[in-house]
Amino acid sequence: MADFEVLGQTVGTNRFFVIGGPCVIENRDMTLRIAEFLRNACARLHIPCVFKSSYDKANRTSIHSYRGPGIEEGLAILSEVRREIGIPVLTDVHGVSEVAPAKEVVDILQVPAFLARQTDLVVAVGLTGKPVNLKKAQFLAPRDMSLVIEKVRGTGNDKILVTERGTQFGYNNLVVDMRSIPILSESGCPVVFDATHSVQLPGGQGTRSGGERRYVAALACAAVAAGAHGVFLEMHEDPDRALCDGPNSLPLEQVSPLLEKLLDIHRIVRDTYGAQDADIERKTGREH
């Protein structure tokens, strides 16, 4: 599997890593505070981390919902996070025209789940040569993502993360099939589990989406046990007052205890199954 380096941190399959931050940029000061919190929490545990936030949420449920500061102001804030806090940044792009300005600022470009089938966008992101995070669409089977990954690889870009974020289950609900973790791993890409969007209740509160925050930890633990290489966690200083995705975002005080637990699970999985894989390679003569 392809590991890659972003701003001095290795993201891939060898070390557990975290992508985290508020769903959307609400203001500069809060964004910097949460980025600093994430950096410090991960540094204490020696976990590579990437800060994520959006300058625009183009798929909000209601026309009246807050979307973000916009691309110009948002990228300026993300640039400040990268420069002042010193951690790599990730943001999502919603159209081909956004790719060029975003690539000048961020370390990883993300294709949103709803846009995973938009070939022009996927190819444009791949052509930047930047690392790409492909989020599995809620309406796609895990194996279908191999075709999305192929579009990026076709540009010559092999720095790809693929993220599981749940599957539509009837109306206003998502469910996670943990088989998707090993299935997505067959692609050769590091697999991320989006533990917070996976508990979202899309459109579940009428004019906005709901969420079941209490299940974030359980699903994150299950995903890492199933072989996820990293987790994606949205977090906020006051989730109940967040302007986007509050019901499924973690309060900051819950982040470090969860990361400690996930790191322990990851070590067990790595030490147990990594040793088994090496033993199989030795017995079959495939070890070099």
From Swiss-Prot:
Pathway the protein contributes to: Carbohydrate biosynthesis; 3-deoxy-D-manno-octulosonate biosynthesis; 3-deoxy-D-manno-octulosonate from D-ribulose 5-phosphate: step 2/3; Bacterial outer membrane biogenesis; lipopolysaccharide biosynthesis
Any single GO CC term annotated in Swiss-Prot or TrEMBL for this entry: cytoplasm
Broadest EC class assigned to this enzyme: transferase
Subcellular localization, as worded in the UniProt entry: Cytoplasm
Reactions this protein catalyses: D-arabinose 5-phosphate + phosphoenolpyruvate + H2O = 3-deoxy-alpha-D-manno-2-octulosonate-8-phosphate + phosphate
EC numbers: 2.5.1.55
Coiled-coil regions, chain positions: none
Primary location group: cytoplasm
Domain of life: Bacteria
Name of protein: 2-dehydro-3-deoxyphosphooctonate aldolase
Annotated organism of origin: Syntrophobacter fumaroxidans (strain DSM 10017 / MPOB)
Gene: kdsA
